[in-house]
Amino acid sequence: MPAIRVKENEPFEVAMRRFKRAVEKTGLLTELRAREAYEKPTTERKRKKAAAVKRLQKRLRSQQLPPKMY
């Protein structure tokens, strides 16, 4: 768990923002949500495969030349 030292005369909101950023950087919340309920190995493989296909499609779409507009 990330630890944040609150500096002297630092507002609570700023310290809270730094803490949230540190938690987000470690990926703690995403890991917690993933472990919240059991996911069957086949479901996990299927989800990861779908995410990989989606990433590939996005990469190909960004590399593709735009259609001619004339």
Curated annotation (Swiss-Prot):
One GO CC annotation: ribosome
Keyword list, A-Z: Ribonucleoprotein, Ribosomal protein
Pfam families: Ribosomal_S21
GO terms (BP aspect): translation
Keyword Coiled coil among UniProt keywords: no
GO molecular function: structural constituent of ribosome
InterPro entries: Ribosomal_bS21, Ribosomal_bS21_sf
Entry keyword annotation includes RNA-binding: no
Entry's family note: Belongs to the bacterial ribosomal protein bS21 family.
Miscellaneous remark of the record: Present in outer membrane vesicle formulations which are used as vaccines in human.
Protein name according to UniProt: Small ribosomal subunit protein bS21
Protein's organism: Neisseria meningitidis serogroup B (strain ATCC BAA-335 / MC58)
Gene responsible for this protein: rpsU
